[in-house]
């Protein structure tokens, strides 16, 4: 049985890992963030940038690769105060977009994450696993994005291809 899905490997993305309290992050990064998500495991979006709350005092800033230089200049990772950590990790992740009518079925095959809208809302963003690999999973209006460590990109692409056959 085939599934009606499209799996696309997304090019590199700008990704910053931030650790610290919301107040400390706001004091340092302030206007350069899309805003803080309302609840853990969700994302706030503004101007194509996403700010993800993925754990206690743990955040990810995700944006188009063209924004990396400007964000680096604004966030100044090497000058961050000692109560926060700002690290550019853009080169560590491989992103995939999964879209189509059967996208929920494919994600259910790939991951144990409960994707019901009451549990994983439209702006859901969390770490879980995909085919046993640690994966960042984002709900998007058209489906999902999955990100795995760069070295596992080909493996995840193969697993997704096999799951949709």
Question: Model-flagged regions — what are they?
Answer:
Residues 1-165:
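Basic, glycine/lysine-rich polyanion-binding surfaces/domains
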């Amino acid at each position: 049985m085939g599934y009606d899905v499209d799996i696309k490997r997304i090019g590199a993305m700008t990704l910053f890992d931030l650790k610290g309290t919301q107040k400390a992050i706001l004091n340092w990064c302030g206007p350069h963030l899309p805003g803080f998500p309302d609840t853990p495991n969700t994302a706030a979006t503004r101007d194509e940038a996403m700010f993800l709350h993925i754990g206690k005092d743990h955040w990810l800033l995700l944006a188009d690769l063209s924004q990396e230089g400007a964000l680096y200049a604004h966030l100044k990772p090497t000058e961050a105060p000692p109560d926060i950590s700002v690290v550019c990790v853009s080169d560590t992740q491989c992103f995939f977009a999964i879209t189509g009518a059967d996208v929920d079925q494919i994600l259910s095959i790939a991951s144990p994450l409960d994707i019901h809208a009451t549990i994983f809302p439209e702006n859901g963003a969390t770490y879980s696993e995909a085919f046993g690999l640690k994966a960042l999973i984002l709900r998007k209006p058209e489906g999902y994005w999955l990100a795995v460590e760069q070295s596992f990109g080909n493996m995840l692409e193969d697993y997704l291809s096999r799951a949709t056959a």
